[in-house]
A protein has these predicted regions:
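Intrinsically disordered, low-complexity terminal regulatory regions
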Residues: 1-117, 133, 155, 169-212
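A generic local secondary-structure boundary/capping motif
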Residues: 78-79, 131-132, 147, 160
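A gly/proline- and charged-residue-enriched helix-loop-helix capping module
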Residues: 122, 126-129
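Membrane-proximal, non-catalytic sensory/regulatory domains of signal-transducing membrane proteins
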Residues: 141-153
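Soluble sensory domains of the PAS superfamily and closely related sensory modules
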Residues: 129-141
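Fold-independent oxyanion-binding glycine-rich loops
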Residues: 94, 145-147, 161, 179
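A short beta-strand signature within small-molecule sensing/ligand-binding domains used
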Residues: 152-162
Length: 212
């Protein structure tokens, strides 16, 4: 079920005015995400998310090579599926910290405040978004434009899905952000299939390690 853009914008206006989240103007999963964001102190007026230091980001990326290496072959596939729309494919760890970003030059390098590796995307920091919310919901989630909790993410529509290891534990999130909300329906199944492919890569890597 989707809600008109005007309803979502009105929900945001009401929240910023009186601190109340209207239950009748938001999808159920978005209401839950906003409530979590509010309770954890996310700032709805933020124009961008906080980041780790350069050194901490470098260390995190180095310690997450297994996840990045498994996901990267699927980045270009997802990017091609989006087509000419402005977009970015993003990968995070299980703490919602971005590890890698792939997409068109305009979106990634020329959009002020666009998330980069080391960006903190948990709902506590960045509010409802295509990384932190799938992690909190433990399932595929879409965040369309103004459904994002912080204003800086409103130009984008995002969808994300958790990545799980052999034990079923969430180890990261795979997400796509696009400026056009119209592409999300055709990308949903592709994103989920890519996530399954990455999870299969985890299994293959572990089997190869056992053989050695």
């Amino acid at each position: 079920m989707s809600f008109p853009v005007t309803d979502v914008l009105e929900a945001g206006r009401i929240y910023r005015s009186i601190g109340k989240i209207p239950t009748d103007l938001l999808r159920a999963e978005i209401y839950r995400a906003w409530e979590r964001s509010h309770l954890q102190g996310a700032n709805p007026y933020a124009l961008q998310a906080e980041k780790l230091s350069g050194l901490d980001t470098e260390r995190l990326v180095e310690s997450s090579t297994y996840l990045i290496n498994a996901a990267r072959p699927y980045f270009r596939i997802l990017s091609q599926a989006v087509g000419r729309e402005s977009h970015a494919v993003m990968l995070s760890n299980h703490h919602a910290v971005l590890l890698d970003v792939f997409g068109d030059e305009e979106t990634i390098h020329r959009t002020e405040g666009f998330p980069v590796p080391g960006t903190l995307m948990s709902e506590a920091v960045a509010g409802a978004n295509g990384i932190g919310t799938p992690l909190a919901e433990e399932s595929y989630t879409e965040i369309v434009a103004a459904e994002h909790f912080i204003e800086g993410f409103h130009p984008f529509s995002c969808q994300g899905t958790p990545l799980r290891n052999e034990q079923g534990e969430i180890v990261g999130v795979l997400s796509i952000s696009a400026r056009s909300p119209d592409v999300r329906q055709r990308l949903k199944e592709i994103l989920i299939c890519a996530a399954h492919g990455i999870e299969a890569e985890f299994l293959v890597a572990n089997l190869e390690k056992d053989v050695r």
